[in-house]
Amino acid sequence: STLMRSSAASDVYKRQVLPNAIIINYGDNDTFPLWFNQEVDGVRPDVRIMNTSYLGAEWYIDEMKTKANDAPGVPFTLPRSKYTYTNDIIPIFNVVDRPLELKEAIDFIRSEDPRTKYDLGDGHLVDYLPNNRFALPVNKDNAIASGIVKESDRDLMVDTIYLELPKRTIDKSEMMLLDMLAHFDWKRPIHFTQV
């Protein structure tokens, strides 16, 4: 049956991910088998399952911040005022000529300073990102302690991962993913699924 195949597929996903991981997937066909497997069969209660299709909804962001089963919440740091009835689309203007550290980019969005806002021309100020290039420092000790990287591979690790978004806007779910990456500090493995 379809349910058996879906449950078996989700069981494979969840048995192959590292302890205390976050599994990020993109739609109901990926998510519901994982939820079923976890909630009904009790498989991997330490893993947090996150569906990016729902990350545009404030109720889901709030839910992801809280503990579920044995899994801690997702390390989102932006306050509700930055994702409730706002920031559905965030423009990117390349006005800074260097990659921004991801925490710096999220702090820019978090700021209420008018200098960190874009004026739409009618006096309405909106959040924006001042660059589409980002730097994500690698906490090597945490990456090893969490099992993301083996100790034997420490010398192969880079100090910083550079990201470039090939577009002029991000949506709310992408903003939240950047917030998570900026603040997870390599303490939890992050896995992505794709069908």
Protein language model regions, located:
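Phosphate- and divalent-cation-binding pockets in alpha/beta enzyme and binding domains
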Residues: 32-36
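ER/secretory pathway lumenal C-terminal domains and tails of membrane proteins involved
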Residues: 1, 7-20, 37-195
